[in-house]
Amino acid sequence: MEPLFPAPFWEVIYGSHLQGNLSLLSPNHSLLPPHLLLNASHGAFLPLGLKVTIVGLYLAVCVGGLLGNCLVMYVILRHTKMKTATNIYIFNLALADTLVLLTLPFQGTDILLGFWPFGNALCKTVIAIDYYNMFTSTFTLTAMSVDRYVAICHPIRALDVRTSSKAQAVNVAIWALASVVGVPVAIMGSAQVEDEEIECLVEIPTPQDYWGPVFAICIFLFSFIVPVLVISVCYSLMIRRLRGVRLLSGSREKDRNLRRITRLVLVVVAVFVGCWTPVQVFVLAQGLGVQPSSETAVAILRFCTALGYVNSCLNPILYAFLDENFKACFRKFCCASALRRDVQVSDRVRSIAKDVALACKTSETVPRPA
């Protein structure tokens, strides 16, 4: 089998030949990752400055996203009051984002060097994580939207359905469902020599003219279109319900909480869709054989890919601004960390002062020579 699709998204949306200019490729050609894209008119590699810019963006997203998502998971695990059904889903989203952020240094190195230097095992791992993240993120956001729908439109039933234990079970089911794609692409993925360069690719079964487009369309439908449609239906029903009723729960305080959490989930979903729509469309187009025809198009596609990963570091920021409980826990964590540093500095100063005082006292008691 000849490799058709480069597996992770930073590779899926591009294709090129080392010994020619960019062109339209039929789906049965070998597609190479973005760092091997050639200048359409000069047959040269894209500028080093562009590579460095994208790699720098990847590293910034990696560091900021890891700090934010790890803090989100810590807060949910640390505080009992944070273990609500919605926050259990948020934990799952943060976990998926953390895993994919850990792959960005490898992806950045791949782009900068122009080849995959990390071997076959890590190639399979990065491929699997990339696809797991795509499916677990969309499935988790769908579950959060359905959870919000039940809370708003069926408040009595929600008392039995919306529990943290059931949310945990849904999270397990989400990862199991994502394995339907994650495991096969990991098996098909491998580090191969393509045009004298080592590339991390996924081998699509033959006939590739058939399975290539099928693969691309299925990924587009089940990882994006279907979840977004379900989410849209849920929020349409919720908006109609919210407009038709002044009080949802009989309590103004509970009602404010319901609306606040619903707004948070809606914003998280909207940001996700905004960040991932461009790259999803380009993935579908590439799977159908359409390739970028200029260096500018290549640059745009690369930044669209980076935008998808930027989404992974935005969620903790949204929680901090839109959810009072997360904001309070984040503030408590930061204040506690600052207090611990102050205490450590104070203890160190006192220790030094004691040592100096003891040294001075010792020098005073030592008899001077006659």
Swiss-Prot record:
Site feature Important for G protein-mediated signaling, where:
110, 130
Q: Which Pfam families match?
A: 7tm_1 (PF00001)
Under Gene3D superfamilies, the record lists: Rhodopsin 7-helix transmembrane proteins
After translation, how is this protein modified?
Phosphorylation at Ser-363 requires GRK3.
Q: Does the keyword Metal-binding apply?
A: no
Gene Ontology MF terms: G protein-coupled receptor activity; neuropeptide binding; nociceptin receptor activity
> Which tissues is it found in, per the record?
Detected in blood leukocytes.
Keyword Manganese among record annotations: no
The record's annotation in SUPFAM superfamilies points to: Family A G protein-coupled receptor-like (SSF81321)
**What membrane topology is annotated for this entry?**
Multi-pass membrane protein
Query: According to the UniProt record, what happens if one changes residue 309 to A?
Result: Mildly impairs G protein-mediated inhibition of adenylate cyclase. Abolishes antagonist-mediated inhibition of G protein-mediated signaling
State the Gene Ontology BP annotations.
adenylate cyclase-inhibiting G protein-coupled receptor signaling pathway; calcium-mediated signaling; neuron-neuron synaptic transmission; neuropeptide signaling pathway; phospholipase C-activating G protein-coupled receptor signaling pathway; sensory perception; sensory perception of pain
Q: Where are the transmembrane segments?
A: 49-74, 88-109, 125-146, 166-188, 212-236, 265-285, 301-322
Record topological domains on the Cytoplasmic side:
75-87, 147-165, 237-264, 323-370
Disulphide connectivity of cysteines: 123-200
User: What does the similarity note say?
Assistant: Belongs to the G-protein coupled receptor 1 family.
Q: Which PANTHER family match?
A: NEUROPEPTIDES RECEPTOR, NOCICEPTIN RECEPTOR
What is the name attached to this protein's record? Nociceptin receptor
